[in-house]
Regions:
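Elongated, amphipathic alpha-helical interaction scaffolds
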Residues: 1-298
């Protein structure tokens, strides 16, 4: 039997690769850990027409956990390695995370091969895709670049990693949704959960969304088979998304407050340097106390 291209990149560590189904699983990851669904998603993203799920090999690393985060799905097809990530919040740090993940993938693939030989060690071509369905408005397609994180970058970066982000909220990327029924129905399910959370508790909203989807034949077989697990994961995902929103809001407000305070201090210093107003008048204008103004004079 002829060797498939991806068979050349089998991990050298037994039991090191499989679909990620245990670490803080999500509905998206659970859906697309199924090779048939994953192949359909790959075909839609890449405008391909593969029909045999065995052409695709899932190689998600079970032990690739960094700072409490884990790669969602990794797979090889032909000589290409794809890292798929699902995000429900805006995250410009995905290129750095993917850099960690891809390094670990390559390390496993080449574990018993010499990197000191005179022969070039071939590796599958990496591709990085993020599927975003957060509530912050974003374009249908955009990119995150690792070089955006480099401080004092001069000229072209010597290292780059580009993550293509696809907005998979309902109403976005119509052509992609048209070619992947599972992705389209997943977007419909998420939209229903969000709609119902406006009027009822999260638990009730998720159960109502699941029931309605089954009734409308949206992911019906999947939801019937995995009802309890989907409800539990959806509640966890939504709670996590809301907590991350609160954290970002707090960080923004703290930064905004800090910026306002700096502006007040700069104004006070300028007025003191002009020496046109009394300390009392400057205090009234800036809201700073006399003692604070005296410290600025020192």
């Amino acid at each position: 039997m002829a060797m498939r291209p991806q068979d050349r990149y089998k991990s050298t560590t037994a039991g090191a690769v499989s679909a990620n189904r245990n670490y803080k699983d999500t509905v998206f990851r659970m859906l697309f850990s199924d090779k048939k669904n994953l192949l359909s998603l790959y075909n839609a993203v890449n405008s391909r027409d593969y029909t045999n799920p065995d052409d695709l090999e899932i190689v998600t690393l079970e032990n690739a956990i960094y700072m409490g985060m884990k790669n969602d799905l990794a797979f090889i097809i032909d000589t290409n390695l794809y890292l798929y990530e699902h995000q429900s919040t805006y995250n410009p740090n995905m290129p750095l995370r993917d850099l960690f993940y891809i390094s670990s993938e390559y390390q496993k693939m080449l574990d018993q091969k010499s990197l000191y030989s005179s022969s070039l060690q071939k590796i599958p071509t990496p591709n990085f895709i993020e599927f975003y369905n957060g509530s912050d408005p974003v374009c249908d397609v955009f990119e995150h670049r690792l070089s955006s994180a480099f401080e004092h970058l001069s000229g072209e970066p010597k290292l780059e990693l580009i993550v293509t982000v696809l907005n998979i909220n309902e109403g976005h990327n119509a052509l992609l949704m048209e070619h992947c029924k599972t992705l389209r129905e997943y977007a419909q399910y998420v939209a229903k959960v969000r709609k119902y959370t406006a009027d009822m508790s999260l638990n009730e909203a998720v159960e109502c969304a699941v029931d309605e989807c089954i009734k409308e034949n949206i992911l019906a077989d999947f939801l019937r088979k995995n009802r309890a697990e989907v409800i539990s994961m959806s509640i966890f995902e939504y709670d996590k998304e809301e907590e991350e929103k609160k954290l970002r809001k707090a960080e923004y407000e703290a930064g905004e407050k800090s910026g306002i305070q700096k502006a007040v201090l700069n104004t006070a210093r300028h007025l003191l340097e002009l020496n046109l107003l009394s300390l009392e008048n400057i205090s009234r204008a800036t809201g700073l106390s006399i003692d604070e103004l005296k410290k600025l004079q020192q």
